[in-house]
Amino acid sequence: MLAKILLLLLLCGSGSIVVYAREFNINCNSNLVMYWGQNSRGVTNPGENQLPLDEYCDKESGDVLVLSFLSEFNADGLHPPGLNLANACVTTFTNTTLLHCPNIGKAITHCQKQGKVVLLSMGGAAGAYGFADDTQAER
């Protein structure tokens, strides 16, 4: 086994090994989907917070990133949507509870330029959301 590894390194040459970022391929059945936004990194690495979204696009092998979560929407038709992205948004728009997340838009654009698909997950484990019927959901 060691001989095969050494042969591979010899054939590749030192310094010529390149790691390529993955891109979403709709015809592939091995795309990797990752959730981002609920500080799951802090769960697996206590004391550490999630990295900014664009850093995951630069470093990780994921093809699709799902932003988690749009936790409140259409609850009563009177309130703006509620977004929960853990530590990614720390301010709100003036006189509202609507989060202001200017870096998220830039990060999404950055990720898309790298061939990543970025989606927004509606719902989550808890929250106020739902639709009365299919017609309301389609609007």
Residue map of PLM features:
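Terminal targeting and flexible regions in eukaryotic proteins, enriched
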Residues: L2-C12, Y35, V66
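Chitinase-like catalytic core of GlcNAc-active glycosidases
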Residues: Y20-R139
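N-terminal signal peptide
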Residues: L2, L10-N27
